[in-house]
Amino acid sequence: MENRSRFASEDFLSWDKEGREVLVVCVAGRFELPSAGRPTTQPLRVSEAQRPPPPADAYWGEPEHSSPRVEGQRVYTRPGTDVYVSGHAWAPGGRPTREAAVGVRVGACRQVARVWGPRVWQRGVLGLKPSTPRAFEKVPLHWELSAGGAGAPDNPVGCGVYASVSAAVDRPLPQLEDPERPLESPTQRVTPVGFGPVARHWPSRRALAGTYDERWVRTRAPLWPEDFDERFFQAAAPGLNAAGGLRGGEEVVLAGMHPDGKVEFHLPRVHLQVESRFRRRKETRALVLDGVHLEVDEGAVTLLWRAAVPVRRDLAEYEGSVVREEEGRP
């Protein structure tokens, strides 16, 4: 594949839900975030060092016991546009505090959380209650610090939810909570607040992958099951997938993620297309923006675009593809 854009790209073969072979082209464009505390309408600078789309998931620790750091991009489609955020919730001005707020807004996507210093469940007159939070300067925006625990379908690596009251004594509470639905009991089931990708093996996402049973082995393997749901390819936390898709130009506000104040800007407007040549035909596809990764600590944002070109049993006649940026479009 010939890449004439300013960004990094990869291509790979896959099958779609109907079992048709497709050539997938994915482009990752990395840009520099503006300074905190200074809203800007100026275009973001393209980073000098571009990184290819990550081929596989990467985790903060062991995959079975930690949350994803990066979502792998070897998928043929993604409904809507995912927004992922990695970084920290900061105390205002970087001065230690016991409680703060953090939030992100990208177009119509929005996520907010109350941030606490470290707390544990402690015995009280009427049962267990949260201890007084200790002061903090910054808190990682990881699922491990949100509500959940072993057996929780939405967040099995989280904390604060336990099998029994006795099992919760002196055990940690979440440091990231829904401000409108805080955890009030160690056996309560609440919806966790997250900013990073949801792991594909967590029950809430795995349920969309379809049924892999004896019938599938006999009639479909290695294709996707008949009950496969393409929403399985969505990895964004609830509230951070734009169902109608983002197109570029949307306003972005990051609050509480930098000690110097809000980070405010607009997503870059980039239009990409791929032209794939076969011996007897040519296919042209526009790449769709289906991922935005805000790496606040690194001062960068990565946009991910994707297109799937039908192969139509012509793989032996495939001659190559060219990725271009379309100039002059609004």
List the predicted regions and their residue ranges:
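Extended intrinsically disordered or low-complexity segments
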Residues: 2-330
